Structure formats: C-alpha cells, structure tokens
C-alpha cells in the first residue's frame, strides 16, 4: 500500500519547483536590466571623461607639440620616408620588418624579395635601424605609448610601442581628403581595451625630401595614453 503522505507531497514539490523557476527567470530579467543600467551609466561617465580628457590633451599639445615636431624634422626620418617612397617594396614586407631593427639576416630569410628589393633593403637598413633606436629613446623620454612612421599611402613602415590600429589609417585618409595633413593635428580620443588613447600626427617634410607639389613624404604618428597623461 502506497504512503498517502508521499503522494500528497508531489503536487507541493511541483509547485515549489515552478515557483523557483519563476523566481530565477525574474531575477535574470532584473539582472539584465541592471546590467543595462550599469552599462548606460558607465558609457555616460566614459563620454564625460573623454570630453574632459580631450580638452586637457588639447592644452597639453601646446606644450608637447614641439617635441613631436622636432622628431618629425629628424633628418634621418625624412630620408627614410623619401627612400621608401621611391621603392616598390611590398607593404607586407615593410609591416613584417616594421617592429624590429632590420638586419641582413632578416633580409636573406625573406623569400618574397627579388634582387632589386634586397638591394633597396640593404640601402635603407642602416637608416631604419637607427630610427628604431631613435624612436625607442623618443617614446621613453616623453612617456608615449608608441610612435609610427607612415609612408605616402599611410601604411606603417616603422612601428615602435603600441597604439597603431587599421582604423587610424582610415581617420588619417579622411583628414588627408580635407587637406588636414599638411600640419600637426590630433585624432579623436579612442578606447583600446581599458586605456584611453589619443594620436598626434605631424608631416615629415624637408627641402629635398618632398614631392613636386610639396606634399609630405611621410607622417609621424605618436600615441599617448591619457591615463598616464592625467596622472591616473
């Protein structure tokens, strides 16, 4: 004979399970709404902080712009930009060698080069290696996040540190279409991971190293971590 108490508990147990399920669903919806609220609030704070930081960075450029412009006038930097502009070296190769000093061993291992390319790299290598060291020193002295030398197509041919993104090239192309790359400038503040970054650019120009229409042969791009800038 079945125990009547056990039978009578089944409906009660089922009701408890249903109640628990409804409670979990309700809590999940509440958490989702709460998360959305947190995200909205965080986004507003980030937007306000970005605006404030951008204003402070604008003031800061008045102090540090001379340092960036001085680096852009570095003779060897102009020479390398001009030499690269005169070659047809593959962009993929320049990117591959962009973050390390160029050496004969690296040139010899690269299978995508013909004799002309190898000769061009041998000619450029001393300048590129020297500029790499100059960039490292420049970044360290001014506490930048990174620096890059871009060629006439706005492709990076010399990269040191962090900060470069493909979107940066798109923004620079938009500036160039408006004729805004003829002088120093600042790109919009952006979020990369948990860091707020801002990019400063300056044309690499000098007599004898520019094209017939006086357009720059290269662009110096410097990335700054706003958190460090503001002492955060």
Identify the meaning behind each predicted range:
Residues 2-36:
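Extreme N-terminal signal-anchor transmembrane helix of membrane signaling/transducer proteins, especially
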Residues 19, 99-102, 116:
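Long, flexible, surface-exposed domains enriched in hydrophobic/aromatic residues
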Residues 31-47, 53-111, 123-124, 141-146:
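Membrane-proximal amphipathic alpha-helices
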Residues 52, 63, 130-133, 224, ...:
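Short, conserved clusters of charged catalytic residues that mark active-site
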Residues 106-137:
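Intrinsically disordered, low-complexity acidic Ser/Thr-rich regulatory segments
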Residues 206-207, 227-231:
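Short beta-strands and strand-coil junctions in structured, solvent-facing domains, enriched
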């Amino acid at each position: 004979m079945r125990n009547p108490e056990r039978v009578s508990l089944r409906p009660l147990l089922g009701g408890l399970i249903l109640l628990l399920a409804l409670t979990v669903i309700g809590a999940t919806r509440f958490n989702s709404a709460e998360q959305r609220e947190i995200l909205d609030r965080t986004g507003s704070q980030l937007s306000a902080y970005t605006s404030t930081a951008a204003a402070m960075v604008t003031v800061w450029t008045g102090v540090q712009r001379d340092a960036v412009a001085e680096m852009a006038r570095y003779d060897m930097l102009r020479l390398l930009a001009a030499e690269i502009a005169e070659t047809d070296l593959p962009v993929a190769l320049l990117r591959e060698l962009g973050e390390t000093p160029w050496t004969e061993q690296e040139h010899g291992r690269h299978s995508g080069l013909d004799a002309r390319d190898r000769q061009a790299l041998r000619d450029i290598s001393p300048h590129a290696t020297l500029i790499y060291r100059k960039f490292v020193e420049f970044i360290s002295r001014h506490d930048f996040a990174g620096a890059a030398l871009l060629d006439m197509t706005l492709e990076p041919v010399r990269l040191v540190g962090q900060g470069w993104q493909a979107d940066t090239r798109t923004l620079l192309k938009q500036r160039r279409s408006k004729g805004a790359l003829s002088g120093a400038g600042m790109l919009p503040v952006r979020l990369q991971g948990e860091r707020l970054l801002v990019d400063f650019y300056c044309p690499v120009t000098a007599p004898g190293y520019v094209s017939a229409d006086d357009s720059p042969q290269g662009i110096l791009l410097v990335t700054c971590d706003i958190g460090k800038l503001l002492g955060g």
